[in-house]
Design a protein with these regions (language model features):
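A mid-sequence interfacial segment
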Residues: 84-124
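Short hydrophobic segments within beta-strands
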Residues: 4-6, 34, 99
């Protein structure tokens, strides 16, 4: 499983939090985090920046990788839904890559290729915090599927 995320200069607290959840994961459920440089915020339009980031993400995709795009307009999901989806994908041998877009969002062509578009809620979260929330939710989903006591509803 991988997370492709736009942006490379994150505050130290983001890296520390993501690393903390990553080290808790067992090897067979390791998550690879791939940072993709954000498009330069010049006079270009948001659409052209998203297109450039989309092309960079496309170049980083692996064969047979299925995309799950995190998007404000995506389906609002529960942790249990995430856990069930991940268990199903693992059982079916689906290689999954989560995508966190840049400040302008995710290009429509990338959204169209996704097997799922999920929202972490209807609140607006800064991109660094989305990384931390996703890292924690991936760990929590694993804990549900593994019967680990971390998750208490």
């Amino acid at each position: 499983m991988r997370v492709l995320t736009v942006g490379t200069r994150m505050p130290n607290w983001v890296s520390c939090a993501v690393d903390e959840y990553a080290k808790r994961m067992p090897r067979e459920f390791a998550v690879e985090w791939c940072e993709i440089p954000a498009s330069k915020r010049s006079r270009d339009t948001a659409d052209s920046r998203m297109l450039e980031e989309y092309q960079a993400i496309e170049r980083r995709l692996k064969d047979q990788e299925s995309l799950v795009v995190l998007d404000v307009d995506g389906k609002v999901i529960s942790t249990e839904f995430m856990a069930a989806s991940m268990a199903s994908w693992l059982d079916e041998g689906v290689k999954t890559a989560f995508v966190i877009g840049g400040p302008d969002g995710v290009h429509p062509q990338l959204k169209a290729k996704a097997i799922a578009k999920w929202s972490l809620g209807r609140i607006t979260l800064p991109h660094p915090l989305v990384r931390v929330v996703l890292a924690e939710q991936l760990y929590r989903a694993w804990s549900i599927n593994a019967g680990h006591p971390y998750h208490r509803a």
